Amino acid sequence: MFQSFEVTSTPQFGRDRVSALRAGFDSLGIDAFLVPRADEFNGEYVPAGSERLAWLTGFTGSAGIALILRTQAIVFVDGRYVTQLAEQVDGSVFSGGDLVNEPPHVWLAANGAKGLRLGIDPWLHAGAEVRRLEKALSQIGGTLVFLPHNPLDRLWSDRPAEPLGAVSIQNVAQAGVLAREKIATVAADLSKKNLAAVLIADPSSVAWIFNIRGADVPHTPHPLARAIIHADGRAELFLDKRKTGIEPEAYLGQICTQLPPSALEERLAAVSRNGGRVLIDPDIASYALAEIIRRASGEVVEGADPAKLPRAVKNDVEINGSAAAHLQDGAAMVEFLYWLSQEKPGTVSEIVAAERLEAARARVGQSMQNPLKDISFDTISGAGEHAAIMHYRVTTETNRMIEAGELFLIDSGAQYINGTTDITRTVGIGRVTEEHRRFFTLVLKGMIEISTARFPKGTRGCDLDPLARIALWRAGADFAHGTGHGVGSYLSVHEGPQRISRLSTQELLPGMILSNEPGYYRPGSFGIRIENLIYVRGAEEIEGGDTAMLGFETLTFCPIDRSLVIPELLTHDQLHWFNDYHRRTREALMPLIHDHDVRAWLENATLPLEY
């Protein structure tokens, strides 16, 4: 199993740990301390030894930050985690904050005590975030204090060691472009802009540029590493050699100089001396890294990670690999959904369902000689009220049976060498209510509107986001998460800069893979989400039209529960899409499924709906 269902944190230690942290404030010369859910690489997924927020508070979500003051402690989360936060932390110690509308810097400017001294670990905060904090503190006469050591690390006596996951080569057959070509492209751009070098601080960008993958963090196959690429084409990769076997080390030796991570500071300082201009991404690179450049009299040039957009715009090899991975994943999903349909309500638990799905993926991967490398995130397997927790993680404590008359939501994904998948299906268990069916159909309408959208060049994610919500808005409902996130190519299941959300201003470009996942959640009762992955491509021309259009191609093929759809709520075009999607799903997956009973189930699950 690639996931555990054990309880990984508990709220019971929060009070003592916060008290111990506060006890050190005077000696550190601070009045408050920020604890982000981050490591020094500022990635979404972090190794166990960097789960400081969970250790301190009990909150295990993938996004959040705690502000610990002398008499107050606030954990800021986004809409996905409001319910989870309330369940995981001690409410007598911590209050909840709004990470989107009133993040720590906004809260401090409005509520911080005059002259407040805020301590941070400069390795855990990007440069852009530090600027926001400094500006907020200046409004209250406060000071940002950069601490030489993280005070939590001295309190966390059994903190796990740094990971040493093995590095593998991502061959050009999967990557589509040679690493030396990617390095040369970056170097040429640096030279054109009169820059000495760029610091690649995002491990996913390092993995993409050098065509390598790693195993340092759960479910995201990148190595925790940084790189410096010089304008003259030289590349230095700061990667522990204990992670590279003979073949990867020999491969890397042909395209770069591999150095230990401890050499980064000296090499970054060396390229910065005498006014060397070094490009860093202020939204990714730790503030401490920028300070190394400044201390060496170099010039920090802020700009986007040069790999971020090219990594998001998949080449044909990556798109084709993703399509193949999704067919394989769809076959595993069908095997799982068939099994679930045969089980009596009340006899299958949330954990057993997650285990069976992972086993199906492993079995199909073995039969197709494309093994399951990992899951792409911990499976969200939630029944009834648990489905209303957007990022619910079932544990041995919360596990329960999936009962008749309720909705079961399973959001899962896989890592294959040729692609990353992410799919959500909501299933009715036995006879469900008309309210369940109504909201399911409204969510489906939004998903279809995104799937069929046509839009001109220059369209941004925020321009399309309302399409997924209009049907819900008309019913006086909404959902508190984005409609879609970018997805990597055997990399992170959450990839930027592409998104479909209210705040996404990134132009959608051909080759970008995104999720399409509207939902509806009623706390304490039920939750609904339907998710396919899609990619941007050119749309067919319309006779008489004079503007080139883009659209989406669907990558995910898996039946959507017909029993939950009220056909009369769909337009003719929406019903046509639904039936055509099921026809294509049947045609795509039937050749991959050999069990007679599973084939019969797929046939029935994809029959057309009628008014």
Which role does the model predict for each range below?
Residues 1-611:
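Active-site neighborhoods and metal-handling regions in enzymes and metal-associated proteins
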